[in-house]
């Protein structure tokens, strides 16, 4: 064997070896237990991202963005339970790494992730305790927000993905409805004010308003062309110079048709569901009204404070803190000559806020004076 052939032989074997090692590392990272805990953290994030196309879009993750830009996240009950069971698998994998051999930073990361996973798993009895569609968030507001603020419209590929996503609104809303019906069967029903606001929000979105007979009457001449999904697309499309006017017109028609049929029909189905649900709703709005509501409240308290305080203890802390702060405020007001026992603390503060020396003009000069 000549020197040249010997070099090629060993170079080839080296490259092959590196490919095998790289393949083993990638295989372990994706399908099995990663070799070290840093790779495990990477695995958890990657798995989260690839299972949630909407999150990928919101984060604008390179490469992954283009792979998943036609998809919407799975909101089915089955997927929800799959994600929950994965939490248990992730915790078991995390616990398989030797804690004492980890760096100081990784020990902290492990403690935080372990606590989070344990706390989520503890919440299994309350898997359905929540209102997926409410006046603050839900598919009815999250999806339009995603399409308007996160879905890019840079070229024809993005445009096609936008239209495909619009065509999937119906399937997504059906998944959400599935979860809502399961909750309804379990007695987990939003209070009346939540239902009223959600119906009003969705009716406004499709340019209609609800009547006392559940029917919907049109309030805008063409609600599609005034809808954010259409107006946003139209404004972005106008900025693309690589498309002819004829091509732009064709895309606008496609978007208009998807909104008018798929999107608006999905919203209409959700509106009708909540209209029917109103007869079962009450004015009670505390979690105590839910099945095992007191236990759920305790769980939420633990999850959001990282303590084992009881609801009564937290309430007492609140009362004592309010009393302490009020006492300190009265002391300060007395010291400054503002104490007036014939008035409430709130009345004194309101009067204090109106004093000329505490007021500044709402202009550049006034703002400069505040800073100085």
Question: In which residue ranges do the predicted regions lie?
Answer:
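N-terminal secretory signal peptides that target proteins for export/translocation
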Residues: 1-4
């Amino acid at each position: 064997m000549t020197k040249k052939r010997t070099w090629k032989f060993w170079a080839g074997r080296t490259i092959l070896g590196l490919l095998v090692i790289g393949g083993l590392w990638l295989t372990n990272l994706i399908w099995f237990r990663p070799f070290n805990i840093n790779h495990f953290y990477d695995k958890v994030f990657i798995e989260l991202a690839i299972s949630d196309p909407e999150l990928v879009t919101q984060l604008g993750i390179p490469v992954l963005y283009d792979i998943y830009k036609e998809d919407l996240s799975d909101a089915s009950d089955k997927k929800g339970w799959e994600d929950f069971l994965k939490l248990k698998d992730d915790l078991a994998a995390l616990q398989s790494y030797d804690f004492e051999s980890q760096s100081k930073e990784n020990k902290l990361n492990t403690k935080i992730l372990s606590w989070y996973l344990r706390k989520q798993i503890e919440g299994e009895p309350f898997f359905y305790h929540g209102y997926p569609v409410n006046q603050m968030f839900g598919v009815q507001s999250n999806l339009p927000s995603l399409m308007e603020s996160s879905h890019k419209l840079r070229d024809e590929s993005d445009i096609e993905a936008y239209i495909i996503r619009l065509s999937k609104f119906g399937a997504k809303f059906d998944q959400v409805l599935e979860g809502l019906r399961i909750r309804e069967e379990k007695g987990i029903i939003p209070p009346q004010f939540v239902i009223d606001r959600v119906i009003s929000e969705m009716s406004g979105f499709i340019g209609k308003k609800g009547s006392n007979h559940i029917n919907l009457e049109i309030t805008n001449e063409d609600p599609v062309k005034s809808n954010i999904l259409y107006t946003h697309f139209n404004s972005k499309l106008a900025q693309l110079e690589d498309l002819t006017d004829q091509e732009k017109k064709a895309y606008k028609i496609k978007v208009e048709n998807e909104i008018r049929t798929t999107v608006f029909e999905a919203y209409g189905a959700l509106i009708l569901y909540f209209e029917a649900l109103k007869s079962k709703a009450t004015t009670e709005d505390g979690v105590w009204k839910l099945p095992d509501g007191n236990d759920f409240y305790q769980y939420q308290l633990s999850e959001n404070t990282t303590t084992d305080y009881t609801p009564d203890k937290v309430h007492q802390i609140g009362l004592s803190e309010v009393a302490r702060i009020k006492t300190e405020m009265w002391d300060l007001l007395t010291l400054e000559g503002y104490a007036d026992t014939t008035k409430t603390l709130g009345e004194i503060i309101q009067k204090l806020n109106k004093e000329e020396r505490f007021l500044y003009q709402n202009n550049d000069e006034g703002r400069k004076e505040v800073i100085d």
